[in-house]
UniProtKB/Swiss-Prot annotation:
Cofactor: Zn(2+)
Any single Gene Ontology cellular-component annotation: cytosol
Gene name of the record: pepT
EC class of the enzyme, as a word: hydrolase
Sequence similarity: Belongs to the peptidase M20B family.
Catalytic activity entry: Release of the N-terminal residue from a tripeptide
Protein name per UniProt: Peptidase T
Cofactor note: Binds 2 Zn(2+) ions per subunit.
Length: 407
């Protein structure tokens, strides 16, 4: 189905910079997210007919409700999307609209960058569709403003068509998903549902209830600096030790060499001097045993290096971030089976596969609300090559509407 307000709503959202900040200690991590919630989303929620709208400054969540209009539909279902965007320029987003894409190169404004099927063969799946791209200087923000727009559009449609019977619905728009802390303070008592869905997936048909289990690894290395001309048997180069540590991690256990259910170590920043060096990693895996083994391996590696050095110079701090929500959701597959049935009714092929990442649903599921993830449409997310299909967004709205009518 087509929804006349969907595209305009999405374009309005993405033009607002809501980039999160991992260095911040506030909630939300950036004021722009709270402003977006209070000055854009909250008035719109009121205008389209949501009730019991509340913004909680303690956790950054904006919540609203739409009561059931049928006694036959007894479930209470939630839909969740996040307001922040990833760690890439989000100031001055200028979307391009490519109507009826016919294939080939899409120039991204005057940036000198292009979307090419040779680099991004997923483009070939969108022939004839309306694509929204960046101008090459920013990300787009379809992750996850497409999800927000889809939820809003579905609610607007239900209120405008009261003859459509639906269950109790709650919606929540939250902060800081991209920096991994958005759901830490989620208030399950304020979100009284049987189960929920994050609308935060990628291409058409994605339906996910498995995520990585995740940990952060901080490496600190202490060296000893002396003049390089007289350094023999005296200098201890912290940068070299950090490189030695990294070189002992399995060479094939990296993001660029893994897929499916394979885990990895990912070095995402390194800095330092001869005197002191730091490196930051993320650790990811699906199975508990593999996840624990990865964490134990880096701890043991540091101990072995210190033993060889004869001093405590290599320090690792491992902090768990979130866990695979499969262990919660597989206890009752109702939310997955319901979404799957709705997709099949709509002739959408469900693509049920693990998320090689996490969602707010990872943490919310462990708080007691099973929360699988549904496609929102974004492709090539988190950078200048991000794009989304309007037709996929429309189908996401269709799925939301189907779920609340089938609950």
């Amino acid at each position: 189905m087509t929804y006349e307000t969907l595209l305009e709503r999405f374009l309005n959202y993405v033009k607002i910079n809501t980039r999160s900040n991992p260095a911040s200690t506030t909630t939300p991590s950036t004021k722009s997210q709270a402003d977006f919630a209070l000055t854009v989303l909250k008035p719109e929620m009121e205008a389209i007919g949501l009730q019991d709208i509340h913004y909680n400054p303690a956790n950054g969540y904006l919540i609203g409700s739409l009561p059931a209009n049928s006694s036959k539909l007894t479930r209470k279902i939630g839909f969740i999307a996040h307001m922040d965007t990833a760690d890439f320029n989000a100031e001055g987003v200028a979307p391009q609209i490519i109507e009826s894409y016919q294939g080939g190169e899409i120039k991204l404004g005057q940036s000198g960058y292009s979307l090419c099927p040779e680099d991004f063969p997923n483009l070939n799946q969108y022939l004839g569709q309306t694509l929204i791209t960046t101008d090459g200087t920013t990300l787009l923000g379809a992750d996850d403003k497409s999800g927000i727009a889809e939820i809003m559009t579905a609610i607007e449609f239900l209120v405008a068509n009261p003859q459509i019977e639906h269950c109790d619905i709650k919606v929540a728009f939250g902060p800081d998903e991209e920096i991994g802390v958005g759901a830490d303070k989620f208030d399950v008592n304020a979100f009284d549902v049987d189960f929920a869905y994050t609308i935060d997936g990628g291409p058409l048909g994605e339906l996910q209830y498995e995520t990585f289990s995740a940990a952060a690894l901080e490496l600190k290395v202490l060296g000893r600096n002396v003049h390089p001309g007289t350094a023999k048997n005296q200098m201890i180069n912290a940068l070299q030790l950090a490189m030695d540590f990294h070189s002992q991690l399995p060479v094939d256990d990296r993001p660029e060499k893994t897929d499916g259910y394979q885990g990895f170590y990912h070095l995402h920043s390194m800095s330092g001097t001869v005197e002191e060096a730091q490196a930051s990693y993320i650790i990811r895996d699906f199975e508990d045993s593999s996840f624990e083994a990865r964490k134990a391996f880096v701890t043991q590696l540091a101990e072995e290096m210190n033993s060889q050095l004869g001093a405590e110079r290599v320090f690792v701090t491992v902090t768990d971030q979130y866990y695979n929500m499969k262990k919660v959701i597989e206890k009752d597959m109702t939310p997955v089976n319901l979404a799957k049935a709705v997709m099949e009714d709509l002739a959408i092929k469900p693509v049920i596969e693990p998320i090689r990442g996490g969602t707010d649903g990872s943490k919310i599921s462990f708080m007691g609300i099973p929360t699988p993830n549904i496609f929102a449409g974004g492709e090539n997310m988190h950078g200048r090559f991000e794009f989304v299909s309007l037709q996929t967004m429309e189908k996401a709205v269709d799925v939301i509407l189907g779920i609340v009518q089938k609950a």
